[in-house]
């Protein structure tokens, strides 16, 4: 038991030289023996232990059973056994996650320990003992939760020097507890070491649930009894003739008695010449491994009467123990008979010579089982009929009892009426009618009854006050424990996120290394290339295997992100699959590393922002990105800021009704583009999703809203992004209106896409200014960037960037306008400039430009490039460049129109000439 392990050093310290005394015992002087009990008990520190009644059992044998409880400080476990002398505990109660409760209306001394798995009902001898146990259990639980962890083998072990601070905090916590419930004094004789000297519990306290432990404890006690009896029957002549006082006996402690269920290695060795009283003390010491110092508390100078009383008590205890042993022997005998019967059946089965005989035995047993089953069914039916009959009889008895009670009440009422009338008649005879009788006895009875009620109410009030104080302290302490556990959990989650981010970084570097090796080797070495292909395949499949084998992973890379986009793009080419996995790992790593350092302060700033007002602070916050929980609200405000002069109530519903009345010319093209909208998003590919229907209605409503544009390819992606964030059709519709009609130039989505072409030329000039080396490299290989960047501007990167970065771009785009698109377009090329410069072939550059935007995973780095490295970037310069290139483009378009008109005129003149020539020939043929 745990108590033995804890008490061992204390006992040895309180009795120095115990080992020498055990080897060569000497008789102590009489003056030292007189105070031996007091000194031994004072030297022992207070331990939380004692006898409590535990309510348990099943069915008709449920009831209170006395158990010995003791607390283990290292494990925060409350162990209990049948007696204090048992070597092995019956069971334990985990107090680390338990709460305590006491009912004011319950029987005195009853309280409960509630754990997540069960509720244990206990009863103390007195109310004071109950409050003492509750308060001590609260303190032990708080000490366990507030205790510092074991010092690690790292430099952090220096934190172990904060012991005084922890003691100070513990003192403060105890002081706070005292404000709720006053400290309860230790009940004498009911709690602690002294409680173990009480008599053993009765026989009915044997635990049938823990029969194995009971057998072990009984065998241990039997061995102790044999040793005690052998010591007690020594010849009396061996007693010390020099002194009539018993010799003080000490013994070395068990080496490991703290472990429940483990017996001590060395049994205690008695002194050579003990008296009868010392023999009894030695027996108690051997039986009680948890408290090896009980025998130190026995008073030395006893009279003959006290010795006789001790012997009688020992005889009584042995008699009770003998009864319990007989009961145990009966139980074991029944178990042995069952085992022998099973053995006989097995022997008969094995002794059968042929399979037929064995089959006949099996059939015989089956028939017996069937017969027994039928008998059980018959008995069950009989039991049910008897139970039904008994219930009917019980109902009849209850009805008769109610009838009898009613008759008795009537009789009692009639007797009271008769008594009152008799008293009244007597009073009328004894007192004249003009004199009012005085009834002091009745007044006294009323006063006493009222006083008794008041006393009862005072007792109830005191009980409820005590319960309230205890529950307040319990709630206060549980709340503090919960906060402390929450802080620990938060710290562990932060540490796990950091470790997972580092793991993602290492894995991405590993995959990148495999990719480079694969590119470097090529087809030179078939064995090496085959090995690399296997490693790449294992790396690509490792995520799914790990997710299936480890069900408690903190935050695995999900297939879809929070907006439904695929986190790892599904490419067909093996190299692109590996690149997509690397990009997903890097993105996950940057996200995890930025959770605490960046995202948490950003969320706090957004939470404290309050009402949205255009300002420089809001501009910086939008550039940093809007947290997901605030993004719908912020986008609605930004859209309303753009379209408040266009917005009219009921406009969207009116447009929908107009579309239902007649079909729009662009409806067919819209229907074709619905299936091509974000094939990498589950909300638009799932057959049961409502997003495609919402998108169809939004695009049709916009076609009726803006007839000059109607519908243009690319609007479906803009509306889809708005739907994913805002989720409401009308909000997404007005977001599309804000982008097309207020943010983008007027002819951005017209038939000629004039403004879009102008922006491509402006981007070329800005790239030449900001990234001249890159533009020279692209010009050397004749790479036309507009083939890649045209779609960026048309759909605001909707098909290019991963969703985490894309939505940050949109946050700033909805507030600042198209300038943000130019900034991020330049930043994307700056981000990948080194990779592009390494490529020395135009075809390789085009292949890389197809997916290089998906390799961007560090959103913070990209944002820093866009809004810091690309400065200065003035809107005035952007307008001037747009104006210059618009004039050039319009001149080119006019020239093209003129050339087109000249060509059409020449072709028409040719057709006329050809038609005239053909007619003359026909006429000639007709004349002929």
From Swiss-Prot:
GO MF: cadherin binding; GTPase activator activity
GO cellular component term of the entry, any: plasma membrane
Q: Which PROSITE patterns match?
A: PH_DOMAIN, TBC_RABGAP
Task: List every position bearing N-acetylmethionine.
Answer: 1
Q: Which residues form a coiled coil?
A: 298-416, 875-913
UniProt region (Disordered), positions on chain: 1-39, 225-275
**PTM annotation (Phosphoserine): residues:** 436, 915, 920
SMART domains, per database record: PH (SM00233), TBC (SM00164)
The extra comment attached to this record reads: 'Armus' means hinge, linker in Latin and ancient Greek.
Name of the protein in its database record? TBC1 domain family member 2A
Organism expressing this protein natively: Homo sapiens
User: Encoded by which gene?
Assistant: TBC1D2
